[in-house]
Amino acid sequence: MKRGNKLIGALVAVAVVASACGGTGSGGSTAGTSTATATPTASAVTRPDVIVGSTNFYEQITLGELYSQILEANGYKVTRKFNLGNREIVEPAIESGQIDVDAEYLATLLAFVDKNGTISKPTTDPRATQIGLQKALDPKGLTVLDYAAATDQNGFVVTQATASSKSLKKLSDLAPIGNTLVLGGPPECPQRPFCQLGLKNTYGITFKDFKPLDSGGPLTIAALDGKQIDVGLLFTSDPSIVAKNFVLLDDDKHLQLADNIAPVVRNALLNKDDGTLARLLDSIGAKLTQAELNDMNKQVAVDKADSKAVAAAWLKKQGLIK
């Protein structure tokens, strides 16, 4: 989904489950475990055709290329249906069989498919959120595979100079000095449980001031660059983190809901396969760190590199294709 919609979802729509997400999880530092199993196969095995879809922004297209290329390298015929639109278009497409595979975000997808939280609610623990998401996907004939350490969720960043001068690596480092710092973010941030309010309640951080800006966009980036703010709200996979050498502070007390990246696959496709498809897609998640995702996003969004070439280079670097 587009970044603007994603931030609004994180700050507003998902806020209704905040009371159920009180930092009891293990965070997003380790990859998840799906129920899919892999079976070694001979090269002569006939592979099912696969349609890989994506929403309409660069990160999704790159993830779609990662999935497509690793499958193609292992004998699958892949059709790409990228740039389909937002989740309101893509989710019905995978449920109806117009596409077979797409990259998703655990907490956001769970909040979307189970809007009232009657089956499960997103939490700050990726494994618990994955389990809840699978329960919500079961009636739809879909399976969520292993999640990556990489996320696309709210994050708080500082400049390299600020991080070095104040020894900042994680959000809890802000607590003793928060009253000397200015926070920047969307105007609603002071009242939101995953923004300034959450930083106060979870970390005990009280800032000297708050500067209303935009939803993780150019105003926040410019304010950080121009030293108008000390801490800014961006997405954890924002390409400016690499391009500007910002430091993403670790959410060490797990304030944010677990929006780890994971492939979602139609069961009808998995049932035609021998486990190889799930194993191949899971191998991507096992190596996709936050730094690796952010670097690819920077190459595509800032350097204007081709998503297909960026994905191929990453897969080769990781030893996943030749």
Task: Describe the role of every protein-language-model region.
Residues 59, 192, 200, 205, ...:
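An extracytoplasmic/periplasmic, membrane-proximal ligand-sensing/linker region
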Residues 141-142, 148-152, 214, 237-284:
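Periplasmic-binding protein-like
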Residues 123-183, 267, 286-290:
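A conserved helix-loop-strand patch within extracytoplasmic ligand-binding domains
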Residues 47-79, 84, 149-221, 305-309:
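Bilobed "Venus flytrap"/periplasmic-binding protein-like clamshell domains
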Residues 86-87, 97-110, 129-130, 159, ...:
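Beta->alpha turn/N-cap motifs
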Residues 18-35:
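Bacterial lipoprotein signal-peptidase II cleavage site
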Residues 95-104, 178-181, 220-234:
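Alpha-to-beta junction loops
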Residues 113-123, 130-145, 228, 240-254:
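Ligand-binding "clamshell"
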